[in-house]
């Protein structure tokens, strides 16, 4: 859904896959001018990846009604300069630049997810554009050092004025996010 000429991405099912990536194993955005709707990812294994599941909205497209369930995620950092800092799940919405406003993220569900990673789950909305209606149910996050790269960092790139921020690693770190539920 990178260019509007291709239209929206709707009604997608990903199931029973083993995914390995030195970037993000599952990525929604960043170049998404069309909307992403009704996405289901289940019964997958993500291993040896820099990021597990990444929803990054920068170019006007929105994400709504996405469900991730029964997934094992193992992440680690590969280099200090690459996008991402070993997050198993990252969700962010930030403007690409002064002219390109980011879309909205809402209705995201994570169920029965096991994470073994160098960093925690990271949610970052922007001023006036908060992430909304996110559920984490039976999500386990184990933090372990696996690489030589610095810890305690979260990566907001790409985006207008966005950078890597030094924030102590936590199982879950959220800001500018409303109606977020952690259950079990």
Language model feature labels by segment:
Residues 1-184:
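Extracellular/periplasmic carbohydrate-active domains that bind, remodel
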